[in-house]
Amino acid sequence: MEIANALVGNINAGDKPFTGTVSAQSMIIPAYKYPTGGWETDTYWDSVHKAGGGKVPYAVINPASGVGEKANSDYVKLINDNDAVGIKNLGYIRTVYQTRPIEEVKAEVDKYLELYGKDKIHGYFFDEISALNNHATAYMAELYRYVKEKAGNKLVMANPGTHITDAIAPYADIFVTSEVSAKTYLNNYEQPKSAFENDPANAHRIMHMIHDVTPDQYDAVIKASRERNA
């Protein structure tokens, strides 16, 4: 599968095409390459759409470091194109490690549905997540309940980029629990302490974002991610 910039259960290989075998794992595409513009960008999204929702179930949509004030026509097209091939769109929202006023975050949840359509936005990617204290956990719990009740049971993905506690584990459907270089991932990986991350039954709820992956590291990174329940 030739996809660049993908989270696979999770792998991000920069701008190099990913060609490893990922059986029983999946990818999430961060939509950081602008949807239209140049030949390279068009080729990127053509590759994503050819792969389809069977191999790339989700794409993270980030029109303006978040939803922005008005709909972006290029992202409207991208969102529709993703939807047409079975790729679910996740709206990108920062929480600033749960210090951003939660009403602002909730307003962004609503704004994605207003601007891009409740039937086209399938969930949310909450970035800059902390799991370090009771406040952070309570914040995430409130946000999780809001999405499920107000937005219509949309998917919640949270990106702490590091290991989480068992206390916060119930408050996202998927967690990104590692965001490191391939070198660190393969040589200096810190083992998780939570029961959640150490349970293979939770592999479908755990993703790892590994950057600076060279082709000769693909198989080793994939093997390691499987062993680490991602």
Segments predicted by a language model, with ranges:
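Glycan-processing catalytic domains of CAZymes
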Residues: A4, N10-A230
